[in-house]
Regions:
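Glycine- and acidic
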Residues: 144-150
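Intein modules and their embedded homing endonuclease domains
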Residues: 1-140
Length: 150
């Protein structure tokens, strides 16, 4: 549930810029992060962090102001977005030992398979499902080029 479903225009307008930024973060299910340079926003969706085009995100934020009929300007929207970038988690580099699949993440170091998690910081996924090897199947005999492919 979004805080914008129950908040009034008066409540929102009375908030500080940082409080507005936090409500926007909550609206996005706390699934936002900023890159190491503090500029690019990403949203966690379906196992990966996807970069949000800045103008599209600004328009979405303006839409939240409009939803409440709260007055805004491009400067106010930019201020809230810039403040949001200071509050949300900073993206980490994905571990080189992890391979993302549609149905989860394979840890190549220990061979374990895990459900997707924002903490994996994956930016891409292979567009196939991972299936565990059948009895007798090995990378050496059934996929000898696998490690070169990586």
């Amino acid at each position: 549930e979004s805080p914008f479903d129950t908040m009034s225009e008066a409540e929102f307008s009375a908030m500080s810029t940082s409080e507005k930024a936090m409500r926007i973060y909550e609206h996005y299910g706390e699934a936002l992060a900023v890159d190491a340079n503090g500029q690019l926003l990403s949203r966690y969706e379906n196992g990966v962090w996807k970069v949000l085009p800045p103008q599209d995100f600004a328009r979405d934020v303006a839409g939240l102001f409009q939803r409440l009929r709260a007055p805004f300007s491009s400067g106010k929207v930019a201020s809230v977005v810039d403040t949001l970038k200071l509050i949300i988690p900073q993206q980490e580099a994905p571990s080189r030992r992890l391979i993302g699949f549609r149905n989860g993440v394979l840890d190549t170091q220990n061979g374990t398979f895990h459900p997707h998690s924002p903490s994996h910081w994956m930016r891409t996924l292979c567009d196939v499902d991972f299936t565990p090897p059948v009895d007798g199947e090995t990378l050496e005999t059934h996929a000898p080029a696998f490690w070169r492919w990586l």
